[in-house]
């Protein structure tokens, strides 16, 4: 706890203190309104002594953000901070709960990384936080956003939003227990009549937390409707610690719009990442392109002509394996050889975008996502090939999707996860959204019984697609 703050601040209704502009459609529908500013996502963010660069965060998602997916996202580039699946504090302290402990497994190349915990007992939360610190995590985070009934009924996740004094006790206990930065992710309130996000953010700052993240929906909203970005702006007005915005970021334009309209210090992306794992890379490229342009004069950023080399890049770009990770160059990869092909499959991609949305809901048996929920949203931004700003970042070709699926599968196999086949089904489905004929492939994948069978179906489908030959998803 910070010196001079010996008690939890009194709880009052925060709604009267919030800026009264949510009737402004340009603010409540930012993705539909488009970008009206040149402001970009910050290049760095300091959370305590941890430097996040760029200021983008992979949200914690149950069933998704295990060590394989986190490293997969990290290798693609552009993500400044990754977070674990939300994990029961009580579970990690039980000796026999190996599943909960598996959630906290990570590798050195995942830094900086934050562990997210949920629970309602201050002493248990403090002990679990000490364990997290001892394991080498850079930050520890408290989940106050999960709307799942089984979590809420135990007074965890968003269930605690109805009891701010109890939250204050957890804040104080955890802050006193660890030296690493302590953060919190929460929703705006239980419902529209109980908006507590501003008061909660002030409480967090008073108790010495290093940053706050808001999913700009209430628990009652679940994942429906549009995220209320004005609540993020209200929190930013109320506190001096970093504020991370979360909710309805589907594109680089959305990310920049959130920063411009709320003043938030970083953006957090959850449900878009599984179906569009390159979104962090796209945001980094987009912001680099916007920053490089003469935006103060109103000049539109220019795009390197297809077939010409951007600074530091050779002209020949026929492979998906590139030489460097340079966001200003619009091409590049990481040490794992992941990246985007420059233009080889542009016509295929345009037809794919014309036929299917990239964020089509997944198979009904998709996993629970904790606070992030299933992959669907009422607000969807369609990337258009005619949009000048969308040309500032790479769009994945079918060859890219194919390579990413194979790379992710190989990582799952090497990690020997007990649910590897299930995860292969989930992510193969997500990665193929937007590909013509993908629905048939997804059905075939779901019916597959083994990893080799899934791999065979994916291989036959994509090899035929890349050869521009129609093929059935049935590979029997």
Regions found by a protein language model. Give the residues of each.
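Glycine-rich, positively charged N-terminal anion/phosphate-binding segment
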Residues: 43-46, 61-138
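Active-site glycine- and acidic-residue-rich loops that bind
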Residues: 123-124, 186-199
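Non-cysteine beta-strand/loop elements that form the S-adenosyl-L-methionine
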Residues: 84, 138-147, 206-216, 269-273
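Active-site beta-loop-alpha junctions enriched in small/polar residues
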Residues: 61, 87-89, 118-120, 145-147, ...
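Glycine-rich tight-turn/loop motif centered on a GG-T
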Residues: 149-166, 217-229
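Hydrophobic faces of well-ordered beta-strands that scaffold small-molecule active sites
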Residues: 56-59, 82-84, 113-117, 140, ...
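Alpha/beta catalytic cores of nucleotide-metabolism and tRNA/nucleoside-modifying enzymes
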Residues: 2, 17-24, 38-56, 62, ...
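Intrinsic disorder/low-complexity segments
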Residues: 1-41, 287-396
């Amino acid at each position: 706890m910070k010196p001079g703050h010996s008690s939890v601040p009194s709880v009052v209704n925060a709604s009267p203190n919030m800026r009264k502009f949510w009737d402004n459609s340009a603010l409540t529908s930012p993705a539909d309104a488009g970008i009206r500013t040149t402001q970009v996502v910050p290049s760095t963010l300091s959370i305590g002594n941890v430097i996040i660069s760029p200021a983008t965060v992979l949200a914690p998602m149950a069933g998704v953000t295990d060590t394989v997916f986190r490293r997969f996202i990290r290798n693609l580039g552009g993500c400044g901070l990754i977070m674990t699946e939300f994990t029961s504090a009580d579970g990690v302290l039980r000796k026999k709960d190996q599943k909960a402990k598996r959630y906290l497994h990570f590798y050195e190349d995942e830094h900086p990384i934050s562990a997210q915990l949920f629970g309602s007992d201050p002493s248990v939360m403090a002990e679990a936080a000490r364990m997290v610190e001892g394991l080498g995590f850079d930050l520890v985070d408290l989940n106050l956003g999960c709307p799942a009934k089984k979590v809420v009924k135990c007074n965890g996740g968003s269930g605690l939003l109805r009891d701010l004094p109890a939250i204050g006790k957890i804040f104080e206990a955890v802050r006193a227990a660890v030296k690493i930065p302590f953060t919190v992710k929460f929703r705006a309130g239980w419902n529209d009549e109980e908006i507590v996000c501003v008061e909660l953010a002030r409480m967090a700052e008073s108790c010495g937390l290093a940053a706050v993240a808001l999913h700009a929906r209430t628990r009652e909203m679940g994942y429906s409707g549009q995220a209320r970005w004005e609540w993020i702006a209200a929190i930013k007005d109320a506190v001096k610690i970093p504020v991370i915005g979360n909710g309805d970021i589907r594109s680089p334009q959305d990310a920049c719009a959130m920063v411009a309209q709320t003043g938030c210090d970083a953006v957090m992306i959850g449900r878009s990442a599984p179906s569009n794992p390159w979104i962090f890379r796209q945001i980094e490229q987009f912001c680099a392109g916007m920053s490089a342009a003469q935006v103060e004069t109103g000049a539109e950023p220019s795009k390197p002509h297809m077939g010409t080399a951007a600074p530091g890049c050779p002209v020949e770009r026929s492979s998906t394996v590139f030489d460097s990770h340079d966001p200003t160059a619009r091409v590049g990869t990481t040490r794992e050889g992941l990246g985007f092909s420059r233009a080889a499959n542009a016509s295929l991609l345009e037809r794919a975008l014309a036929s299917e949305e990239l964020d089509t809901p997944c198979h009904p048996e998709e996993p629970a996502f904790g606070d992030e929920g299933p992959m669907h949203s009422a607000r969807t931004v369609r990337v258009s090939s005619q949009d000048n700003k969308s040309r500032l970042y790479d769009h994945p070709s079918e060859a890219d999707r194919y390579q990413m699926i194979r790379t992710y599968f190989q990582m799952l196999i090497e990690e020997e996860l007990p649910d590897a086949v299930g995860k292969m089904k989930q992510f193969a489905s997500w990665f193929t959204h937007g590909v013509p004929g993908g629905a048939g492939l997804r059905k075939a994948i779901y019916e597959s019984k083994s990893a080799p069978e899934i791999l065979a179906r994916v291989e036959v489908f994509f090899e035929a697609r890349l050869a521009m030959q129609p093929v059935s998803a049935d590979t029997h």
